[in-house]
């Protein structure tokens, strides 16, 4: 397997750039570049870097030599901390390309080697991928929990309990001829075992029923809807603090769904400004209204700017808003209103934002709970379904097989088996150098 290299720090220019080299040729590379022996392990040293062919000095670098297996990839690892100018980085990378047994790393290849060498598990790699794409505080916390091994610890706890049950079953097979157990004792033993399995299933179902990491990544779907010129565009600008939608006193300014992602107190949200709902013969406007209706159907929260009895049906929560309360003609405020707001004066905006955050915390994953992605949730479900077969069984062989099937799901969760077809997709999400 060839040794790989890549720029592992951010884009230049920068104060310092870190170039990472991983593989069996890392030590020889250090000697070639510095014209000196390999330095002491895990101790940063200052070395001049040279082009082995021309002898030209490339830079003065802080060099860190990390021998396998205690490295981030499980392989010999060399880090070059060079000056972060583009010319310096380009010169070092071009020199590395010319060296034997070296090639540029592909996206996520350092992390993939860490997984293949047993440094991290599959779910930890997935958590790291989510951490790299996290844009809000809640996404960051969930990804850190996963990459820190929270799911692995839960799986290990489940496995230990199943292995204990499996050991009891094996013992009953081994000593069946030597120990006579009356029917009452046998049924009691089976009932206790099934109670333990039922408790495990209940724990699996709790994980299965939680919102997924994809749900957290996509954010809360908040849709603003109402009749034309109801103040939707002005309100979305006020809610996000951005100039998202065109506002004008002319009805029908918005003809399509305008979306913007925004975080309120760390809660990711995707706001959608929609076309005003009314009868129209204009083909373009009708298309916009149809898209608005689809957005309403998919909304987690519908902010309805209109009369409560006219609010569309949706599976999500509906907040009836009464906008433009800065205008005298908008008073008195009618009943059946959740929040009265003014995008001009800001009245009611803070209250509306607090309400959105409150609902978001109920819908999105909780910060103190392990958040699974769809693949992980499906495997937890399959493990629970396998264990459920044991609840109706009277034969210990069937129960033992149900436990084995559940354990195979755990192996797929951690990446010990049956995951080759999804690895390329996972690691392609990583940047080069990670």
Swiss-Prot record:
EC number(s) stated in the UniProt entry for this protein: 3.6.-.-
GO CC annotation, single: cytoplasm
Co-factor: note: Binds 1 potassium ion per subunit.
Places the protein is found: Cytoplasm
A Pfam entry, by short name: MnmE_helical
EC primary class: hydrolase
Chain residues that bind GTP: 229-234, 248-254, 273-276
All residue ranges annotated as the TrmE-type G domain in the record: 219-361
UniProt binding sites for Mg(2+): 233, 254
Keyword match Transmembrane helix: no
GO molecular function, one term: GTPase activity
Disulfide bond positions: none
GO BP annotation list: tRNA methylation; tRNA wobble uridine modification
InterPro entries cross-referenced by the UniProt entry: G_TrmE (IPR031168), GTP-bd (IPR006073), GTP-bd_TrmE_N (IPR018948), GTPase_MnmE (IPR004520), MnmE_dom2 (IPR027368), MnmE_helical (IPR025867), P-loop_NTPase (IPR027417), Small_GTP-bd (IPR005225)
Cofactor: K(+)
The protein's role, per its UniProt record: Exhibits a very high intrinsic GTPase hydrolysis rate. Involved in the addition of a carboxymethylaminomethyl (cmnm) group at the wobble position (U34) of certain tRNAs, forming tRNA-cmnm(5)s(2)U34.
Stored HAMAP family: GTPase_MnmE
Subunit structure: Homodimer. Heterotetramer of two MnmE and two MnmG subunits.
Family statement: Belongs to the TRAFAC class TrmE-Era-EngA-EngB-Septin-like GTPase superfamily. TrmE GTPase family.
Protein name: tRNA modification GTPase MnmE
Source species: Zymomonas mobilis subsp. mobilis (strain ATCC 31821 / ZM4 / CP4)
